Amino acid sequence: MRKLFRQIALSLVAAVAVVSAPARAADPSGEEIVKRSLEAFYYAGNDIRAKVQMKLINPQGQVREREMTMLRINLGKSGDQRYYIFFHGPADVKGTSFLVWKYPGKDSDRWIYVPALKLVKRIAADDKRSSFVGSDFTYEDVSGRNLQDETHALVRKEELGGRPAYVVESKPKTVIDYSRRLSWIDSERWLPLKEEYFDARNQPLRTFTADKVEQTGKQWTVMARSMKNLQSAHRTEVVYQAMEYDIGLKQDIFTERYLRDAPAQWVR
């Protein structure tokens, strides 16, 4: 009998230990990881102003440069955003400006002003994955894609460059220029560290890398990034030389009026 009581007591202790042991948090879903990454990468702060240098490098190592100012504002909790980009140089693109009205769940509205023609051109939704001013980034890369346009699955967890990362596979729901994308997303800062794009034959197409990440105030920011076309060997490097958050931008800056006449206070 004493032995029986002892066995019962040990069983109760074991049961209590199991119940009281801290539960290990489940990993977030692939969709939740990508959602948080889009928020960290494209929505940090209420607004931003950034001085940006872009280098377009061909396979022979020849370089073309672009200098621009980027403005962005978030419009409340709806997820709507406005982007404005003004090109300071070189001469062939000086005065060109680019405007995006972004809406979660549907196609963004995009316009570009070409000063040589004094023309504001609307960019068709089908062109959102075409090259942004001759670079290896697309218009969609600049302002972000819709979460619902792809399915997302967590593949594994691993370190990349000393940072803990989730590896997520995303597949477009419709036929587009790539068949799938692998993303390495920092599991603490939620910024994308690397992305690999594959074409319809599952051959490597483009690779994005976050080359320099810094903390600006409260925000972690990818200050240098690059995109390489693996099939043409052309690559684009982008460096944010200055990044300011929460400077008090007004929504009326992001209109056609300022495509033609840049808001000097903000793009000087």
Residue ranges: model-predicted function:
Residues 21-26:
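Sec/Tat signal peptide C-region and signal peptidase I cleavage site
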Residues 74-81, 156-164, 215-217:
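Short, ordered beta-strand-loop transition motifs
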